[in-house]
Amino acid sequence: MKIKGIDVSEWQEGIHWKNAKKDGVQFGMLRAGYGSAILYPEQYDKTFEQNYKWAKEAGVNVGAYWYSYASTAEQAKTEAESFIKALKGKQFEYPVAMDVEETCITTEAVKAFCSELEGHGYYVMIYANLDYLNNRLDMSQLTQYDVWCADWSDSCGYSRAGIWQYTADGSVNGIKGRVDMNYSFLDYASVIKDAGLNGYKATSDDTVPCVEAKKILEKLAHAKQDIADIEAMVK
């Protein structure tokens, strides 16, 4: 399964989401802001509300992400509170992600950020490139969270990736200039809605709980990688 998507911020202002959908875009990861925006409101992304509204109207599934600068658990919690404020009252079919790019970010900060979001009923994901995932973060402490891997190559080099950002130089109808392109390997929309996360209500009383849903998705991710490895061997 490969579901085509994009991730956007105020750098791609004025997106025509209906045209993007016609061009095959099925989901969009929207930047909500960065840093401690609850203390510094100018750090909220000025296009987040507009992108959310227009993507929804176009029938494009949405997730969200927050660009982090947190080096401590305390800073991470403040950032998470800022993110939650932006997410409140909305529904997201795709995960909400911590964007880990700055060298100051620690594993402890990532744990604190993700735990805060998860405690508020969100399906949480970690965005990072291969170097961070393999060398900078202790991913053994973060196995309960899905991974959105930035790896600008012909195939995703991280076996646990639920979403793969495969280029920052994409082109999509409805967007001026270049845009980050992604593939989702999992049907997040179904799992999130069924589990009653990200602003949705559970579809039934016996819905798979959040933690169990994540375990299922992790197994699917491993199965996806196993299939890819087998296909590579027979080519």
Question: Which residue ranges define each predicted feature?
Answer:
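Substrate-binding cleft of extracellular glycoside hydrolase catalytic domains
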Residues: M1-C114, E118-Y123
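Functionally critical loop-and-helix segments that line ligand-binding/catalytic clefts
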Residues: M1-Q12, K18-N19, S140-V211
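Flexible, glycine-rich phosphate/dinucleotide-binding loops
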Residues: S36-A37, S71, L133, C156, ...
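Residues that form generic nucleotide/phosphate-binding pockets
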Residues: A86, D194, M233
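Catalytic domains of cell-wall/extracellular-matrix polysaccharide-remodeling enzymes
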Residues: F92-G162
